[in-house]
C-alpha cells in the first residue's frame, strides 16, 4: 500500500501548478565561461561578491544563478591556479541577464589546473545519477574519487581507490581473481557495478589506468537502474577524447617483479572529431609462492560533434587477464591456520583466464538550454575460464587437524553477453514559482549466460574427485602431482534474462529552502526460460521461466536553512529479481527492499571544508546469497546456486570530511558504523551477523603540494590511513540442523598505512608509493574456503612524461 501512496504523491507533484508561496519579484543571471581558445570551461567558480552567492560552471561551460534581487553586482570568476576575472553587471527585475566570460588560459592549461583538485565533497556531481543534481540538493550520500586522487595515490586496483570511501570495502577476492565489494552490509554484485552508465561484469578486477574517476552512490538507486542490490552503486568513468593534442607515457615498476608500461594519447582528428587511446600491459609475480599474473588492456574512443547540439561518443575497451588461481590459506575447524603468508596450496598450473570486451555509444542532444536527450547503446561480452585444484574445505574435502588435505579438481567456463538500450530526457522548467528538474527515461537490457560444467573422476580411487593429498603445514610430506588431467564436460546451462523499465523522477524546488525529490520506476523482468544440455546423454532439459513486475518508488525531502547547510531524509522501496537458481535449479523469487536515510551536508569555512553525516536503515525481505550446500548436501562452489536466507536488516551511521586545497594541504576522512543481522529467518539464527561485513571502517588521507615552496617546488607527498574492523566469515549456524557443525569464523581487524611522494618538473614526473608500511596482516574471505591474505609491505615507482 505504501508504494501506491508514493506513486500518487509523485503524480500529484508533477502536475502542481502553483501551491507554494510565491517568490518575490526576482531576476536570473546566466552565461558561459570559455577558455581563450574558445572551448567551454567546466568546474570554474562563479561568485557574486556582494551577496556571497555562487555556483560552478557545468561541462558545457554554462552557469545559472536564480532568484536574485534587482540591482548591480560584481561577478568574480576564479579557479585555483587561474587568473581571476571580474565583471560588473546590472540585473533588472523579472528579466534574464546573460553574460559570458573568457579566461586567460587555454583548454590544456585549464585541464592541468582543474585536475589539482579545486572541488569539495559536495561540489562533485555524479554522472551515474542520469541527471546532474547538486549534491547539496540530493537526499542521498554520494562520493566521487577524482582523477587527481587516483594519480597521486597511484592506484593499481579498485580496492586502492575505495580506501577513500568509508563504508565501502573489499570483503573477498575469491580465487585471487576479483575484488568482491560490499557497502552498508550488502554485496555490490554485477547489477550494482557500472562502467560509463552501463552494467559491468565485476568477476575480474577492472583496469584502473583507463579511469577518469570512480563514482559511488550509497543506498538505493533502484529508480535509476532497477534490479540493484541494497548497498549502493559503483560507476567507473573512463577517460574521454579531447580536442587538444596531448597524452602521457608512463612506466611503473614495483615489488615482486611488477612491470607496467602505459600509453595515453588524445587529440583532434578534425574540427568535429576527437580521439583518445589508452592502453597498458601489466606483468607481475606475487608475494604468494608460484602465483603470477599478466594482463593487457586497450581503450579507444571517438567523440563526434554533429553540429552545436549533438555529440556522439563511441567507446570500446578490451581486457585480457590471465593469472594463477589462488584460493588462499587454509582454515581448520573454522580457525585460520598459522601458515606463512606466502604459502600457496594450489597446483602450480592452475589458472583463471578472462577476456572481456565492451562497445558503448552515447548520444547527447541538447534540445535547448533547458532540455536534453541522452541515449546509451552498449554491448559487453565476458569469457571466463577457471581450472585448478578445488578450494580448501570445499566439496566435502576438509583440511584435517594435522594439516592433511585431499585435493580435488574444479573447472568451469562461462560466456556472458550483455545488451543495453537506454533513453533519458532531462530538463528544467517552472510551474508557477516552483522549479522542476525532471528525468524521464526507459531502458531495456538482456543477459545471455552459457556456463559449462566439468567433472573429474579418478577411476583409481573409487571414481571420486581426488587429485592428490598434501599437508598444508609441511608441503614436503607428500609427493605432489603436477600433471594436468583431462576433465569431462558434463552440462551446458543456457540462461537468458530480459528486463525492461520506465521511470520518472522530479526534483521540485517548493521554495528556495525546501526541495522535494520524488520518483517511481516500473520494472518487468523474465528470468529462466533457458535449457540445460547434457553432453553425455545428449539431452536438453528446459528450465522454468519466472517473470516479475513491480513499482519502485522514491521520496526525499531537503531543507536548506542556508546555502551551506542541507538537511535531508528519504525513503525508497525496490525489488531485486534474483539471478541464479536454487539447489534444484529452479528460479529464485524476488527480494523486496525498504531503505530509509537521513543526514546533514555542510560546507564550512567558506566552502573550504565539507562535512557530512548520514544515518540509514535497509531491510531486505528475503536475502539471496550463495548456497552453502548443493542438492546432494555437499559444499557448494557454484556462485549461481543460491538460497533465500530470510529477512536481513542493516543499520548504520557514516561521517565524511573533505577539504579543498588550503595552502597546499588537502584532506579526506571518514568513519562508518554498520550492523547487519538476520531479523527473520527459518534458516539461520535470528540476531546472528551477516558474514563479511565490518562493523567499523575508517579512512584518512593528508596530501601536501609544495608548488610555491622554493627549492621544493614540484614536490608533493601524502599519507593514507585505512581501518577495517573485525568481521566474520565461515558458515552461519543452521537452526534446522541438530548439532550443526557450521559456525562463524572471526577475521581480524587491521590498520593499513600507505605513503606516496612525487616530483614534477615541466613535462616529467616521478612518483613512488610504499603501501602497507607496517606490514599488517588480515584476510579477504569467502566462506571458509577462499582465505586470501592482504598484500604485505610493497613499493612501486612510476616515471611519466606528458606529451
Residue map of PLM features:
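Periplasm-facing N-terminal accessory domains of Gram-negative outer-membrane beta-barrel systems
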Residues: 6, 21-111
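Acidic, small-polar-rich N-terminal luminal/periplasmic segments of exported/outer-membrane proteins
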Residues: 39-42, 47-52, 66, 80-82, ...
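Outer-membrane beta-barrel translocator/receptor signature
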Residues: 210-212, 223-300, 306-310, 357, ...
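Acidic/polar loop-and-plug regions of large Gram-negative outer-membrane beta-barrel proteins
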Residues: 282, 286, 299-366, 370, ...
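Membrane-embedded beta-barrel scaffold of Gram-negative outer-membrane proteins
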Residues: 364-368, 372-378, 382-388, 566, ...
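Structural signature of Gram-negative outer-membrane beta-barrels, strongest in the C-terminal barrel
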Residues: 416, 435-437, 443-447, 493-620, ...
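C-terminal beta-signal and adjacent terminal beta-strands/loops
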Residues: 621, 667, 722-739, 758-803
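Gram-negative outer-membrane beta-barrel transporters
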Residues: 643-732, 798-802
Amino acid at each position: 500500500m505504501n508504494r501506491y501512496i508514493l506513486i500518487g504523491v509523485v503524480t500529484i507533484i508533477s502536475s502542481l501548478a502553483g501551491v507554494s508561496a510565491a517568490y518575490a519579484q526576482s531576476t536570473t543571471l546566466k552565461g558561459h565561461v570559455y577558455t581563450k581558445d574558445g572551448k567551454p570551461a567546466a568546474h570554474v567558480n562563479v561568485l557574486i561578491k556582494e551577496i556571497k552567492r555562487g555556483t560552478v560552471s557545468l561541462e558545457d561551460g554554462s552557469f545559472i544563478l536564480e532568484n536574485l534581487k534587482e540591482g548591480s553586482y560584481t561577478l568574480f570568476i576564479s579557479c585555483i591556479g587561474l587568473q581571476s576575472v571580474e565583471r560588473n553587471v546590472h540585473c533588472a527585475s523579472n528579466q534574464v541577464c546573460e553574460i559570458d566570460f573568457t579566461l586567460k588560459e587555454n583548454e590544456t592549461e585549464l585541464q592541468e589546473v582543474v585536475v589539482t583538485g579545486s572541488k569539495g565533497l559536495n561540489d562533485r556531481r555524479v554522472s551515474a545519477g542520469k541527471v546532474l543534481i547538486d549534491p547539496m540538493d540530493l537526499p542521498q550520500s554520494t562520493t566521487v574519487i577524482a582523477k587527481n586522487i587516483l594519480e597521486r595515490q597511484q592506484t593499481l586496483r579498485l580496492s586502492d581507490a575505495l580506501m577513500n570511501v568509508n563504508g565501502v570495502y573489499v570483503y573477498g577476492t575469491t580465487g585471487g581473481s576479483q575484488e568482491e565489494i560490499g557497502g552498508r552490509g550488502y554485496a555490490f554484485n554485477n547489477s550494482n557495478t557500472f562502467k560509463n552508465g552501463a552494467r559491468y561484469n565485476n568477476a575480474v578486477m577492472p583496469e584502473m589506468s583507463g579511469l577518469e574517476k570512480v563514482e559511488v552512490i550509497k543506498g538505493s538507486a533502484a529508480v535509476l537502474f532497477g534490479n540493484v542490490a541494497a548497498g549502493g552503486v559503483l560507476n567507473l568513468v573512463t577517460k574521454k577524447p579531447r580536442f587538444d593534442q596531448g597524452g602521457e607515457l608512463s612506466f611503473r615498476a614495483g615489488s615482486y617483479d611488477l612491470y607496467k608500461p602505459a600509453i595515453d594519447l588524445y587529440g583532434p582528428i578534425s574540427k568535429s572529431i576527437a580521439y583518445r587511446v589508452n592502453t597498458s600491459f601489466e606483468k607481475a609475480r606475487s608475494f604468494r609462492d608460484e602465483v603470477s599474473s599478466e594482463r593487457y588492456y586497450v581503450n579507444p574512443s571517438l567523440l563526434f560533434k554533429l553540429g552545436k547540439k549533438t555529440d556522439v561518443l563511441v567507446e570500446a575497451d578490451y581486457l585480457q587477464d590471465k593469472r594463477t588461481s589462488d584460493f588462499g590459506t587454509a582454515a581448520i575447524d573454522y580457525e585460520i591456520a598459522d601458515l606463512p603468508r606466502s604459502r600457496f596450496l594450489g597446483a602450480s598450473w592452475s589458472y583463471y583466464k578472462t577476456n572481456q570486451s565492451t562497445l558503448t555509444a552515447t548520444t547527447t542532444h541538447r534540445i535547448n538550454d533547458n532540455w536534453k536527450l541522452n541515449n546509451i547503446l552498449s554491448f559487453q561480452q565476458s569469457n571466463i575460464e577457471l581450472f585448478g585444484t578445488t578450494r580448501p574445505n570445499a566439496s566435502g574435502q576438509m583440511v584435517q587437524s594435522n594439516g592433511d588435505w585431499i585435493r580435488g579438481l574444479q573447472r568451469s567456463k562461462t560466456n556472458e553477453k550483455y545488451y543495453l538500450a537506454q533513453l533519458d530526457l532531462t530538463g528544467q522548467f517552472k510551474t508557477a514559482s516552483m522549479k522542476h528538474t525532471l528525468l524521464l527515461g526507459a531502458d531495456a537490457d538482456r543477459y545471455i549466460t552459457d556456463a559449462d560444467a566439468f567433472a573429474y573422476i579418478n577411476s583409481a580411487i573409487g571414481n571420486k574427485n581426488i587429485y592428490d593429498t598434501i599437508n598444508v603445514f609441511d608441503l614436503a610430506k607428500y609427493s605432489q602431482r603436477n600433471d594436468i588431467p583431462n576433465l569431462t564436460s558434463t552440462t551446458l546451462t543456457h540462461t537468458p534474462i530480459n528486463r525492461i523499465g520506465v521511470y520518472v523522477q522530479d526534483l521540485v524546488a517548493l521554495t528556495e529552502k525546501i526541495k522535494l525529490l520524488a520518483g517511481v520506476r516500473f520494472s518487468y523482468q523474465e528470468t529462466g526460460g533457458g535449457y540445460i544440455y547434457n553432453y553425455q546423454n545428449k539431452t536438453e532439459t528446459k528450465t522454468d521461466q519466472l517473470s516479475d513486475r513491480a513499482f519502485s518508488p522514491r521520496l526525499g525531502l531537503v531543507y536548506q536553512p542556508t546555502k551551506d547547510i542541507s538537511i535531508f531524509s528519504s525513503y525508497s522501496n525496490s525489488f531485486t529479481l534474483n539471478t541464479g537458481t536454487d539447489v534444484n535449479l529452479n528460479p529464485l523469487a524476488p527480494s523486496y527492499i525498504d531503505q530509509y536515510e537521513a543526514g546533514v551536508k555542510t560546507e564550512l569555512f567558506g566552502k573550504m571544508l565539507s562535512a557530512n553525516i548520514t544515518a540509514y536503515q535497509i531491510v531486505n525481505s528475503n536475502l539471496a546469497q550463495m548456497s552453502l550446500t548443493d542438492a546432494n548436501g555437499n559444499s557448494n562452489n557454484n556462485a549461481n546456486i543460491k538460497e533465500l536466507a530470510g529477512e536481513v536488516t542493516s543499520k548504520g551511521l557514516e561521517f565524511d570530511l573533505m577539504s579543498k586545497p588550503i595552502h597546499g594541504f588537502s584532506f579526506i576522512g571518514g568513519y562508518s558504523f554498520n550492523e547487519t543481522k538476520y531479523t527473520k529467518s527459518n534458516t539461520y539464527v535470528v540476531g546472528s551477523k551477516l558474514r563479511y561485513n565490518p562493523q567499523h571502517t575508517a579512512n584518512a588521507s593528508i596530501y601536501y603540494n609544495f608548488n610555491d615552496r622554493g627549492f621544493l617546488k614540484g614536490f608533493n607527498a601524502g599519507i593514507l590511513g585505512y581501518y577495517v574492523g573485525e568481521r566474520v566469515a565461515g558458515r552461519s549456524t543452521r537452526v534446522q540442523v541438530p548439532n550443526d557443525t557450521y559456525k562463524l569464523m572471526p577475521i581480524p581487524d587491521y590498520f593499513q598505512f600507505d605513503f606516496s611522494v612525487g616530483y614534477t618538473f615541466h613535462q616529467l614526473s616521478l612518483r613512488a608509493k610504499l603501501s602497507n608500511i607496517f606490514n599488517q596482516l588480515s584476510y579477504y574471505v569467502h566462506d571458509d574456503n577462499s582465505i586470501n591474505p592482504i598484500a604485505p609491505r610493497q613499493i612501486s615507482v612510476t616515471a611519466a612524461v606528458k606529451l
